[in-house]
Structures are given as structure tokens and as C-alpha cells.
Amino acid sequence: MHTKYQHGGDIYSNKVSIDYSANINPLGLPQGVKEELARCIEEPVCCVYPDSQCRDLVKALADYHKVTQDWILCGDGAADLIFGLAFALKPKKALLLAPSFLEYEQALKAVDCDIDLFYLKEENGYRLDVEELCKTLERANATYNTTAVGCSDQQKSTSEANNGYNILFLCNPNNPTGITVKKEQVLKLAETCEKTNTFLVVDECFEEFLDEPEAYSIIPFLEKLSHVFVLKAFTKIYAMAGLRLGYALCSNEDVLTKICQVRQPWSVSGLAQRAGIAAL
């Protein structure tokens, strides 16, 4: 029996004139992307295997974000990387915000991860109380989390018991509420996650819609945050949902290697790679 489709953007099960379920740029594909895709049809892009390492796209993204190419991993949309991360790390216990993006939970359930929810309260406008979230992590991790990914052998040896969270997902801006968390608060959360050995995933896929995305992104700080994994996508801002293109930034190359080991080799099509470069 097939699993019922739960993501937004399902314009196929029923006729839809205006789709409010998927937050995609209503302006559509950029003109430069359209022109690049037309060139791809004339060239043998669709007739050959794509570069499994997305080298040209990775270089373009590294230049765009001013980071080393070794920190970047491209995927078949951000969802591909979410599932890849779950299968690579196989966390035992996770903390998710609610409401938030559904596919975090789906990916974690696929690896039999226990999930707790940190509820965003309607009376507070669904705003995240970072202080309380940090306290929740600390209470759950009265001792070091010995099964966490990315923690040192010395940290692992400091504890024999673990009741804490292996992984935490933060969507910023949050989907579906649109509520944001300033980078100073995200960095505070990252500091707590480092202390509790909780791997932090920060989904920044909607940040390009903000007036000042630099006030929220923690990408410039990744060099010192080996336990943080940032998700980005071309899906929303460039209206490329049908092409499927996302990417992750992480300074922990061991984590990126583990993800590559559990994924198919050609997860990003040649068309998507060329479109991504054109979009940048």
C-alpha cells in the first residue's frame, strides 16, 4: 500500500487553480534559467550521465557563499538531503518543533528514530522561545550524549548513560508559520547543542524571501560549528520545484561523506545542475 502524499504542491489529485500549499516564488523561473534550459535541450545534456559530484555547481555555490567547496553537498531537493542525513547518522532520539516542515519527521521515522515535539504556542504567535528550547535540550542531556554524531572520543567517554537528543531540526524562517529567529539566537542554540552533543540542522530554504537574510543566516559561522548542518534549496526562491535541486553546507566533512555513502550516485540531474548555476 502506497503512503498517502502529505507534502504541499499536490496539484494532481484534484484540479487546483491557485495553489497556496507550496510557498514557491509566483514570478516563476528566472529568464536566465529558462534560456539555459533551452540551451541544454540543444546540447547533449539529457543524453549523458550527469556529474555525480556536481563539480561546476559546487564551485558556483562555494563562490556565492564564500566557503570552501568541501563543505557543500548537492541533492535532489532539500528533502533528498534530509533523508540522506537521517540514513547516514541514524539518530536514536530527535527533537522537532511543531508546527514545522513535515519531512523532518518522515525522514526520522524511516530510520526508527524516537521523536519528541517542542510545541510553538499559538498565544505567542508561534514564535520560538530559544531560552526554553535550550533548557529542554539541557534537561534531556543531564549527561553527555554518547551516541551523538560528530562528538569527540573524549566527550563520548565522559558518560555511560544517555537520555538526550541526538538531533534537532530548526526551520528558519519556519515553514509553515514564517516566523524567524535572528542569527544571534540561532548561534546561542548552536552553542547549547554543542554542549549537549546534539547535531543541529538549520533549514534556511526560505531565507532568500527575507528583506535582510544576512541577519538570520549562520553560514558565515560554520567553520567553528562542525555539529551544524545548513539546508538550502533552489525550489522556492527560484521556482524550481519541478527540477529538484537543493544543497547543504557543513564544515564536518565526515558527515558529508557518510551521506554520500547512503545515496544514489546521480541524485542531481544535468538539467538541474545547469539551471542552478544559471540561477546564481
What is each stretch, according to the model?
Residues 1-48:
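N-terminal "arm"/small-domain region of PLP-dependent enzymes with the aminotransferase-like
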Residues 28-30, 227-280:
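PLP-dependent aminotransferase class I/II
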Residues 50, 62-84:
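Short loop-beta-helix segment that forms the pyridoxal 5′-phosphate
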Residues 68-72, 93, 204, 226-227:
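Short acidic capping loops at alpha-helix termini that bridge into adjacent secondary structure
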Residues 88-107, 121, 135:
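Conserved PLP-anchoring active-site segment centered on the Schiff-base-forming lysine
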Residues 111, 195-196, 225:
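Helix C-cap/helix->beta junction micro-motif
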Residues 122-210:
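Active-site phosphate-binding strand-loop segment of PLP-dependent enzymes
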